[in-house]
């Protein structure tokens, strides 16, 4: 093996050792043991919400441990591949060396991707995520675009086996959605998805235009951490107005014969939250209250950041606006305007393959915070 490659493998070993230390591999094993004990409790499923969270965290933690252990195994096998290549002769030697080099490059990329997880150290990064998507300028195309974005995030969650809980969907008259709110139940979902917050722009030939003209549409993505009891977001009963109405589906059609949908208005701030996806009024009220608490927590965080920016003389950040462009016509490209990361196959991105964008966004945010 060439000395340069030996040095590069040593650098990979150092990087992976850092990842193992930051992720606390022994701590992961202990956490898995505890979660497996909880999951084996026959009474766990008496509380569906808790059961879902326990099984989701168990699956995520097991996957995280497997990923790190597999990286360590591959790194230990890598020098062996180069030794075997050195023993070959002629064309076989070239093929074996190419195979070893390919594994080296793949392993380096996988370790770099795992390093991203160690950058999620913000106060709320470990939380589950509450995502709201709203259609913007662009009429029916914008409503359709908002629904496409929702599908993209749901598909991403499904590919990672993260449960998704839809709280509310407000359908547009002709097609698509006006807005939707859903939770992604997975550890670090907030820290990961928070880089998606901002305006997403779509350029395509409109399927709703009988002249097949090009249309630019916008949708806004908001990502909040799910509130926990330790956040102490107490809402006096008199501060909330509760309105009930019938759930509606696409085109405004009623999907329920009772007034099960709930609208909460926080009187002091004017924040309005709706929930209509649960079967009962009580369930919708509980879900809507969770969303309202998350929005009030975010409002508190924004106020605290504004005070800090004022002390620092910082004008604040507007990076969330126009954060990504999805062009389907006249060429095909998805490009993040903050990180410059881009992919030439929008179809795969819209089908949930967004890990590259998430990793680039997390690294960008980390560099920005260090400045």
Curated annotation (Swiss-Prot):
Keyword Protein biosynthesis recorded: yes
Localization (cell): Cytoplasm
Disulfide cysteine pairs (residue numbers): none
One Pfam family cited in the UniProt record for this chain: RF-1
Signal peptide span: none
PTM sites of type N5-methylglutamine: 253
Keywords for the protein's UniProt record, in alphabetical order: Cytoplasm, Methylation, Protein biosynthesis
PROSITE patterns (alphabetical): RF_PROK_I (PS00745)
PTM statement from Swiss-Prot or TrEMBL: Methylated by PrmC. Methylation increases the termination efficiency of RF2.
GO MF annotations, alphabetized: translation release factor activity, codon specific
Assigned GO CC terms: cytoplasm
Family named by the database record: Belongs to the prokaryotic/mitochondrial release factor family.
Function description: Peptide chain release factor 2 directs the termination of translation in response to the peptide chain termination codons UGA and UAA.
Protein name: Peptide chain release factor 2
The encoding gene: prfB
